[in-house]
Amino acid sequence: MDVNRRIGVKDALLALLLALLQGCPLGETAPNASPLVGSNWGNPRRYVHLQTSTDMSNFYLEIRLDGTVRKSTARTSYSVILLKADTRERIAILGVKSNRYLCMDLEGSPFSSPTCIRDDCLFNHSLLENNRDVYYSSRTGILFNLEGSRQVFVVGQNVPQTSLFLPRTNTVPLERLLLHRDKRNQVVDPSDPHRVAVGRAEEGSDSRALQEDDADLEVETEVEVGDDGRNASRERLQAPSDHDPWGVFSSNPGSPRSSGTVG
């Protein structure tokens, strides 16, 4: 009798435990309130253009090869951005083509760096009620603004129009972003260091690749001329390393800072 009673108690406890588990699944967690931790954020395939606007036009954040941070009226290779989550609400903003991070100094002036400096290159992110994103320095709280004005972000306070951003889907073909990287990482044959034989064998395909790259530069030059009426800069083409895309292991990079005029 006692044995049957014990078995009955165990069965009742087991049934109660199963009911509790069904009501509160072990895998259930608090809802994720931050879009930065979503499956698309921080994914290398999730390239975007950060768009802001004035009453007259739309603009896009550009991070150039020479480190210049500026705005562009058109989507170009240098306006392709990767938002990389550091925490639920803190991100790094990487220019994919230039392989440089957006940063901000203590005065709120933007610059870029080939390495992610924690104090300067991490931004807090907030999604406002109007479905616009703002990015502000994790150290000073100063809003990133493509017009260059400086304001500390305060919840509920009016935000400058050019500090409000919309992530737009990337429209630049990936081969235009990765062309120089692929060329730089080609293995050199010791018996043909100047790649004469390879050049003859691939003359047709190589010339097509160069034409695509020239077209890419031509579009961006037209944007520069349209902004200020003259060619603002001439840049030396260089490529990031596939083995260290975040610049973590870069040794002695010199001064990582490269200031840029926003405008």
From Swiss-Prot:
Residues 249-263 have a biased composition (Polar residues). Residues 198-263 are annotated as: Disordered. Glycans are attached at residues 124, 231. The keyword Heme does not apply. SMART domains: FGF. Keywords: Disulfide bond, Glycoprotein, Growth factor, Secreted, Signal. The keyword Transferase does not apply. Residues 1-23 form the signal peptide. GO terms for molecular function: growth factor activity. Residues 212-226 have a biased composition (Acidic residues). Disulfide bonds join 103-121. Residues 198-211, 227-245 have a biased composition (Basic and acidic residues). It comes from the Eukaryota. It is found in: Secreted. It holds the Pfam family FGF. CDD domains: beta-trefoil_FGF23. GO terms for cellular component: extracellular region. Belongs to the heparin-binding growth factors family. This is Fibroblast growth factor 23. It comes from Tetraodon nigroviridis. The gene is fgf23.
